[in-house]
Amino acid sequence: MAQQDVKPTRSELINLKKKIKLSESGHKLLKMKRDGLILEFFKILNEARNVRTELDAAYEKSTEKINLASAVNGMVAVKSTAFTAKEYPEIQLSGHNIMGVVVPKISSTGVRKPLYERGYGIIGTNSYIDETADAYEELVEKIIAAAELETTMKRLLDEIEKTKRRVNALEFKVIPELIATMKYIRFMLEEMERENTFRLKRVKARMKN
């Protein structure tokens, strides 16, 4: 707010006081929101780290199982078995609210299947195929869990950055400028008051003479 564009009036001073009070209140609320979002972010971060560790372990396990199954049965047989699946997992997307931020909720059905629902015949396959299917079903579950948590973290982090910018703008620009303008108006009003007092004294002095 440019001070030269402000009229040094009492009504303007009152308006500025209201703006300062409102800005300080908004600043306080935004700081609370920022701190709350940061707390939520770190809660989810710990969970995401655990899920990521589990995902890495599931990936290594599934790779080991498919390599073993391929060594025993041949890669062509393993791929042919995989293509016999008649039903595929379904993903459901919804959202929920964390301190005003809509984050994803990812649920799934049909990831884990009993042996008889996998599509391939029990006869003609062996336990290596079954263990590979188990490992990959677990891997898909971990991928879904990691996707939900990591997307949530990204959205929270984006909102934290936006809120921090607004907090800083109020704290270091808006509020200081409002306070400086308020002081300027007070100074000008005091100057005008002194000038008026001085003029009145001169008028009274002339009247006495």
Curated annotation (Swiss-Prot):
Gene Ontology cellular-component annotations: plasma membrane; proton-transporting V-type ATPase complex
Main location: membrane
Gene name in the database record: atpD
Function as written in the Swiss-Prot or TrEMBL entry: Component of the A-type ATP synthase that produces ATP from ADP in the presence of a proton gradient across the membrane.
Record's bilayer topology term: Peripheral membrane protein
HAMAP family per the UniProt record, alphabetical: ATP_synth_D_arch (MF_00271)
Top-rank taxon: Archaea
Subunit structure: Has multiple subunits with at least A(3), B(3), C, D, E, F, H, I and proteolipid K(x).
Family as reported in the entry's similarity comment: Belongs to the V-ATPase D subunit family.
Alphabetized Gene3D superfamilies for the sequence: 1.10.287.3240
Keywords recorded for this protein, A-Z: ATP synthesis, Cell membrane, Hydrogen ion transport, Ion transport, Membrane, Transport
Taxonomic lineage of the native organism: Archaea, Methanobacteriati, Methanobacteriota, Stenosarchaea group, Methanomicrobia
Name under which the protein is recorded: A-type ATP synthase subunit D
Gene Ontology biological process terms, A to Z: proton motive force-driven plasma membrane ATP synthesis
